[in-house]
A protein has these predicted regions:
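C-terminal His-loop and adjacent cap/lid subdomain of alpha/beta-hydrolase
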Residues: 1-453
Length: 453
């Protein structure tokens, strides 16, 4: 038994490496209640101040936790299907070392959230339910990012070049280089490409039409307008406040040109392109945009005496980006995509200001599960925050408790923001939950749901 510094309870621990070199950690509290939570990021999360409190809380409630660290070669060899296999190996180890759990939950954030969703659809046999936080779905994500970045490249290049800041070719959005400029985790870049984009955004922001065009990119990409930390959440009926928020958000997004972790996603299929816009009608996308963003775009174009229809025509005439059939075959395999057909209950959370994964992916998932007749298996909740995966311990705890209530009774408890916030407070997890209504953040439908075949 190990007795660490508070707030961890006394626990037993097993650590090691799986056959592919992935590190793992298993912790079983002395007063284990039979529930096992698996998490892609448990091993690495133990040293992450934004995550460790959640794990402490789980153990304090009697839950065993088993999970991994992300593989050191993940930036070049990302494969969620292999990560799922690793989690089954981890469950084998757990059962051989301790005992068969009464219940197993798959829990995770970002890539771990994708793992949870994929398990619920394609590999549910050994898991009772999933809690997915800030989940990405690679092709969905790269396509929705491509839309906004394509608009930015087409409409903002003139400001960058016109100001003498560089050449049009500096503003790269796809087929990004493996030249060491990407962070080893696959998230974010340094060097000339993000620097060029920051300069382009600043140059465009100095012009009224440039500001309107930045807003158009956010609307067509279905990106959240408020993703920059330490900035106020803008009023949705204030076009100027929304535009300022989008500009600050664009500067943050510039650290991942073409979309968060694009290099990692492209590398997964031998560098082949997984996103495309060859069949996209951006005029139709504007009609389908979030109403507040669409109104802001129209207001800003009118204020700048800009030609919105002309810019849409310009987008229509610009050569598009095609996907590789090899890449799409890779991403179509079980475990690498989700289509909204869970076989077990799913509780999904997303932050409205997530800069890595727009909250609109969750809206697309909601539409998909309803269309597939799976709506009763799924509940979702939106959190008022910027960042990525920095969920409060209370938010994590109430999501798990909500899932357990569903498994124990067969019915979902109330998952309205008010009910979730109240139950989170009652759990006394040490911080406060920030669940919010979606009012004003809706879109008629998500543009980039991908169902292979």
């Amino acid at each position: 038994m190990t007795a660490p510094d508070a707030p961890w309870p006394v626990f037993r621990e097993k650590t090691g490496q799986l056959p592919d070199g992935t590190e793992y950690v298993i912790r079983v509290p002395e007063k284990w209640n039979g529930l096992l939570i698996r998490d892609l990021d448990f091993a690495s999360g133990l040293v992450n101040p934004e995550r460790v409190d959640r794990f402490c809380d789980m153990a304090a409630r009697g839950y065993a936790i088993a999970g991994t660290a992300r593989h050191r070669l993940r930036q070049w060899q990302y494969d969620p299907a292999r990560e799922i296999t690793n989690h089954d190996r981890l469950l084998d180890l757990f059962e051989a070392t301790y005992n068969t759990p009464k219940r197993v939950l798959q829990y995770g954030c970002s890539g771990g959230g994708h793992l949870a969703l994929a398990i619920s659809e394609n590999f549910p046999e050994r898991v009772d339910g999933v809690v997915a936080l800030a989940a990405h779905v690679p092709v969905w994500l790269m396509n929705t990012f491509l839309d906004g970045w394509f608009v930015l490249k087409v409409l903002l290049t003139e400001y960058y070049v016109g100001a003498g800041l560089g050449r049009a070719g500096d503003l790269v959005i796809a087929e990004l280089p493996n030249d060491g400029s990407a962070h080893p985790t696959g998230h974010g870049m340094e060097g000339k490409i993000p620097d060029a984009w920051c300069k382009a955004f600043t140059a465009a922001h100095s012009d009224g039409l440039g500001r309107a065009r930045i807003a158009l990119a956010f609307a067509l990409g279905q990106w959240g307008a408020w993703v920059a930390d330490d900035t106020p959440q803008p009023a949705l009926d204030d076009a100027e406040a929304l535009q300022e928020a989008m500009y600050r958000s664009a500067l943050r997004l510039a650290q991942s040109p073409g979309g968060e972790a694009r290099i990692m996603f492209e590398n997964a299929a031998q560098g082949q392109q997984l996103s495309w816009n060859t069949d996209v009608d951006y005029g139709a996308f504007l009609e389908n945009a979030n109403p507040a963003l669409r109104h802001a775009v129209e207001t800003l174009y009118n204020k700048a005496d800009g030609d919105l229809a002309g810019d849409l025509e310009r987008l229509a005439k610009t050569p598009r980006i095609a996907a590789s059939s090899h890449a799409l075959d890779f991403w179509a395999a079980p475990g690498r995509n989700t289509i909204g057909q869970p076989k077990i209950p799913v509780m999904r959370l997303h932050m409205v200001g997530d800069y890595q994964i727009p909250y609109t992916l969750m809206l697309g998932y909601i539409d998909a599960v309803r269309a597939n007749g799976c709506g009763e298996l799924v509940r979702t909740a939106l959190v008022r925050s910027t960042g990525h995966c920095n969920f409060a311990t209370a938010e994590s705890a109430v999501a798990i408790e909500t899932m357990l209530a569903r498994l124990e009774t067969g019915d979902w408890p109330d998952t309205s923001p008010e009910a979730l916030n109240a139950r989170a407070t009652a759990l006394d997890a040490g911080d406060s939950a920030r669940f919010m209504e979606i009012d004003g953040y809706e879109a008629p439908h998500f543009n980039r749901t991908w169902v292979p075949g």
